[in-house]
Every structure is written in structure tokens, then in C-alpha cells.
Amino acid sequence: MKHPLQLLAFVCIMLTLMACADDRRGGTAEPVHHPANAIYHWKTVYNPTPYEKDFLKKHQIKRLYLKFFDVGVDNLYDGKGEQPVPIATTIFRDSIKHIGDVEVVPVVFITIPALKCAPTLYSLAEHIIDRVDDMCWANHIAYREVQLDCDWTRETKPLFFELCREVRFLLHERRKGLSATIRLHQLRDTLPDIDYGVLMLYNTESLVNPDVRNSILSSDVVREYMRHVEADKHLDFAFPTFQWILWFKDRKFQGILRPGQDTNVEGCLRYEASLYREIIAAKRAIRPCLKDIGYPSSNIIYHLDSANLSRFTDHEISEIYRP
């Protein structure tokens, strides 16, 4: 008969092995995600204005999805041809410490050409995590998850899904999580191997179509997409607050102008804005359709910009964030 201490040691070893096996399968000991008021930062320079810092405090923002960099392609001079490279890296002009107790989620935008030319998706995953680590270390950011953003289609779905598996495996080894943005058209397919998704409720119609009234957000389009959809992952929801001017000439799309830019151009201009009533209508359209896996969803605003956010009252912002 074994000594009680030997039995205790045996049990401890078995529990440790089971935990390690769970790590290899991509499991985590506890969810890395919790519901919170959140907002995106989608600029190449991080330097929030006093208004934007006050917005974070006033509306009790606890999570900031901060775009770190894009993964594009470049022709390298080592004979290897096109290779994935980081581009449009965010420059930090201000310290994250100045926004208080806000969790920062690094976001990486993956271009389709980068997916297609990567030597291996495992090596791409390693490079992404290494760069996120370096940027977090340099800017004193402690992170618990990474988010990938990619406009994948059914054709490129296998590549992006494999990248998600590789990134998630590397993150779960460190007890960190992986999320991904999900566009409405992507809900028709199964979702990638992620811990949760963020459903992007903007750009719901084609901005290049001259006959569309408002391409940013149409609650009718959202309702139609959600009618026959049940997501197989937990989803949070991102709502737009931005505005823009679309330029057409001879019914052909020419480009996007920002409010304040010179609009003395030849052709037709269409002003579009995120409307509060459409945001609330979209919230009502999606809630009954999605699976609850044990914790409530978060509402997220896109994005942290004083010129756009100042168009909304404090009450309207509170209603957008209301569960």
C-alpha cells in the first residue's frame, strides 16, 4: 500500500499533466473575456485628445481595442519574392497609463495578399505574436488577448482559419485569448477557431453603389442577415459612430472625403453618418438571434474620435452601451 504522501504527489502530477494536455488542445483555465464597455482606436497615431480621455472616464470604458499594425506584403531583396510584413504601425505619442484602468486589446489587420504569400501560417503567427509582444513591452502594455481583423471570404477562409488556429495555440500556451472581427456576410459560414468574435455592424451595404442611401449602417440589412443565422461562437457587437462623404462621378465611385476636407470636386457627393436611431434598431434586431454561452455580450463603439463622438449626447452613448 502506498504512503498517503506518495498518493498525494501522484494526484498532483496527474492534475498537472491534465492541465498541460488542456493547453495543447488550446484550452484555458478560465475565460479571458468579460463583458465591459469598450471602444476601438483605429488611427496610426495614439495621442488621445482631452475630450477622448474624458470620454473614456465618463462612460466607464474598460476595454480599448487598439489597432497595432497591418500585415501587408513587400518585395524583399533576398530573392524570396513577396513576403508578409508589418505596415501602418501605430505610433504612440502618449502613454497608455494616462487613460487609467483600461484593458488594451492589440488588434492586427491581416490583408488577403499577406495570407496568400506567407511561407507558412505558423511562422506568420509567430511573427505576429512576437511583434505584439515587442510593442507591448515598449509601451508598457499588459495584454490578455489579441484580436485579428480580416475581410476573409469563402475562398480565403481556409487560410485565415488556419492562421487563427496557430495564433490561438500560441496565445493559449501563455494563458491569453484570441478574438476576431466578424462581418455580417461571414456569419453565413462557420466561424474561425477563436475564443469569441466581434460582429462589426457597419459598412452594411456597398459604399461604391451610387443608389445606396447610407452604406454605414442599415438596420433593415442587419435584420435580414440575422433572420436565418445562429452564430456558433459568443459574439460582442461593434456599432459605428463615424461619418464620411462619398464622391461619385458619372455614377462611378471616386473616393472617400472626410468632413472638413475640400469638397469642391466635379461630380456628386453623398454625405453619410452613423445615425443613433439606426444603431438602436440594429441592437433590437440582433439580440434574439444569437446564442448566449453563459456571459452577456459587450457593446463596442467604433471608434475613439472626438469629431465623431461629439455628435452624440451622453444619454445616446449610454443607451448604445446599455446591455
Regions found by a protein language model. Give the residues of each.
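Bacterial N-terminal signal peptides that target proteins for export
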Residues: M1-L8
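Substrate-binding surface in catalytic domains of secreted glycosidases
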Residues: P158, E162-R251
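Structural recognition of alpha->loop->beta junctions
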Residues: Q60, D133, W137-V146, D189-S206, ...
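Chitinase-like catalytic core of GlcNAc-active glycosidases
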Residues: E30-W42, K67-L199
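A structural motif corresponding to the C-terminal end of an alpha-helix
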Residues: H59, S95-V102, D134-A142, L170-R174, ...
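C-terminal motif of bacterial Sec signal peptides marking the signal peptidase cleavage site
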Residues: L17-A19
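Bacterial signal peptide processing site
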Residues: A21-R24
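Substrate-binding cleft of secreted/luminal carbohydrate-active enzymes
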Residues: D236, F242-W244, K249-P323
